[in-house]
Regions:
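Boundary detector for helix-to-coil junctions that initiate low-complexity/charged tails
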Residues: 377-415
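N-terminal cap/recognition module
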Residues: 28-57
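Glycine-centered tight beta-turn/hairpin loop motif at sheet-sheet or coil-to-beta transitions
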Residues: 23-27
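Nucleotide-activated chemistry modules centered on ATP-dependent adenylation/adenylyltransferase
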Residues: 1-21, 48, 52, 57-117, ...
């Protein structure tokens, strides 16, 4: 069972949208906190809260009662969204039936105004620049508002939310993010949730889309276009499913009240850097770094995200002084083996870019090809070993007569 009610509270200059969830065995409350100045823009529909909790609902299954008004077109699309995730994660995603107190089916002529999630990283920086400069083609929109959302379940937000010693450093990161947006004349609205306080069976990489889209949906009555910067290139060597933001299930996170634009999914990281190559301030200040505890205003230069960005700069032959950007400005291609497990997709993007443009330095192409070949060999060996091991365990378990004990035996060795 799942039942959702929402109440509103105002306190200390903020407005809280508090979701009360009856989960059957227990009850939870999760809030979204916004500056009180945003109140006039927020919808009274329950659409955002349904999307916010869609993964929670799938984890429980069954009838899900929504004690408010929901767009019929959204519910129609969410049915297909759920079907996607049931196929991708059958052990976690159950069938659900969303039952709203009232379904609204009012066609709306969508305006050209947009709201966007902004993090200060390469994806969102490139997307903001593309739309601001009119470079996004027929999907170019008039961005009116940027949202910075914190309090999620990713590692950086979790530390920023709970660790008092980290909060000051995190504030510096937010200031840096604001400096990038303000360089183009945009302000950032800071939104906080306490989602990190709640439990989930999903990986953050699977469920993050629900948080970011739902918070933007709070503004759906005024800004009919929600812009999400894609973190995944759609090339066949790069695209990963399941993944929170993807070109399949993202299509079902829409209604007749808004259009979701997943911007930049047809671009590699190198293409995105090329897009902002004339925006020097962003090149030197964007937050492409996973290390959040650095005391300086520079990026660490050691994490995999920093290493990938350095690699991209070098692949594009950019004349950038790494001393201005990184605590560790060194660049050595021999270091790139250890992050291949996390960065192999980005290595493939570099090679793809070179096939199209033929401009990446030869030593980079040769080194990345060597690393990827080695990585592929290791993966194939591990897969073969695991397959033979599984066959061996299944063969032994055949002699266990009781099915329940047999399955328990097999699962024990799979752990």
């Amino acid at each position: 069972m799942f039942e959702l009610k929402v109440r509103e509270e105002e306190k200390d200059g903020f407005i809280y949208k508090i979701m009360q969830m009856d989960l059957g065995a227990k009850k939870e409350e999760v809030y979204i906190r916004l500056p009180i100045s945003e109140k006039e823009y927020l919808t009274n529909m329950y659409d955002p809260y349904v999307v916010f909790n869609i993964f929670k609902m799938m984890s429980i299954g069954g009838d899900c009662y929504i004690r408010g008004k929901v767009s019929k077109s959204l519910l129609d699309n969410l049915e297909m969204f759920v079907n996607c995730w049931k196929i991708w994660l059958p052990d976690k995603c159950k069938d659900i039936k969303i039952i709203a107190d009232e379904e609204i089916d009012e066609p709306v002529k969508l305006n050209n105004d947009a709201i966007m999630c902004f993090s200060g990283g390469l994806d969102s920086v490139a997307t903001l620049y593309r739309h601001h400069k009119g470079l996004a083609g027929r999907n170019n929109r008039n961005i009116k508002k940027l949202l910075a959302i914190t309090g999620s379940r990713n590692i950086s937000d979790a530390r920023g939310y709970n660790d008092e010693t980290y909060k000051e450093i995190y504030k510096k990161r937010l200031i840096r993010m604001e400096s990038i947006s303000s360089d183009l004349g945009f302000n950032v609205v800071h939104v906080l949730t306490n989602l990190t306080d709640t439990d989930t069976i999903f990986e953050w990489g699977d469920e993050f889309i629900a948080l970011y889209i739902s918070v933007m949906m709070l503004y759906q009555d005024n800004y009919n276009n929600l812009i999400m910067a894609s973190d995944e290139f759609v090339g066949q060597d790069s695209i990963v499913v399941p993944h929170g933001s993807n070109p399949i299930s993202n299509n079902f996170l829409q209604s007749n009240k808004f259009k979701l634009i997943t911007d930049g999914q047809f671009m590699t990281r190198l293409d995105k850097l090329e897009t902002i190559k004339d925006w020097d301030f962003a090149l030197k200040n964007m937050l492409a770094c996973d290390e959040c505890y650095t005391e300086t205003n520079k990026l660490c230069g050691k994490c995999y995200k920093c290493l990938v960005t350095k690699l991209n700069y070098k692949a594009l032959n950019y004349n950038i002084d790494f001393n201005e950007i990184y605590d560790d400005p060194s660049f050595n291609l021999e270091e790139y083996d250890w992050i291949c497990e996390y960065a192999n997709i980005f290595y493939k993007e570099v090679l793809y870019y070179d096939k199209i443009h033929h401009t990446v330095p030869k030593e980079i192409v040769v080194r990345l090809t060597e690393i990827l070949n080695k990585y592929t060999t290791i993966i194939n060996i591990n897969n073969n070993v695991n397959k033979k091991y599984e066959e061996f365990i299944n063969k032994i378990s055949w002699w266990i007569p009781v099915k329940k004990l047999r399955e328990k035996f097999i699962n024990k060795f799979k752990e």
